[in-house]
Amino acid sequence: LGYQVIIPGENRLLNGLRWDSRIDPRQWQPLPTVYERAAAAGIAAVHVTQGAFRGTGLTVATMRGADFRPADSMGALAAQAATALRESDRAFVTVYHGDLDGTGHAFGVGSDAWYNQLAHVDKLAEQLAGALPSGTYMCVTADHGMVDIGAEDKFDVDEHSDLRSGLALLGGEPRARHLYARRGAAADLLAAWRETLGDRAWVLSRDDAIKEGWFGPVDAAMTSRIGDVVAAPAGSLAIVATKAEPRESALTGMHGSLTPSEQLVPALMYTAA
């Protein structure tokens, strides 16, 4: 639902990347993962990624059921994936490499650094394709796109006290904000944000965002995690909070909104002969 969402019943946010030791990831995300479903069907399920991700809250919430194979270099990613595929007649293996995303955040999409990193990703895909057992199907894709945000496009909520009136918690991220209202203030909060941002952002109530399919099918138990108001910037606007979120506010590349550059991703298919 978002990078940072409210913990129902508590006046604090859960950051999905940093997690919170007080929150059990199995309860936070109770549905069977694709790895658990694969294993239940007799298919070997393996996830290959950086060793630092082993056992994190996000990994347990989304990747549990997978045989976690740590790999801290591109060469190791390709080798671990190939080994996992050779070990079983039927296998579902995912490989995650996050450096292209990190480079985009730091330097921007289309920067020299980003294109250099993209060349490394292309080489990784080539190595994976060359190591696949016959009949193996490979899909190379991404979990999101990205847009570049200039300093002039950063709208700092910390400098607009009128937009914080009635706001209990500012969640989400600069390109996908969840606004949690104080009791009875949701309607006024929605009106204030719409008036200030105008056509620079899509600003909807929780109910309208759900009706419009922003979050796909929403289980009733998850509804309260969504902001009372949600704001998705159009164009290259970013809704930052330089005091509360200095690190996120300083990024060059961002994602999370509804623009094609953020929602459309490549899907390259290959079947080994």
Across the structure, where does each feature detected by a protein language model lie?
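Feature captures the catalytic ectodomains and active-site-proximal regions of enzymes
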Residues: L1-A273
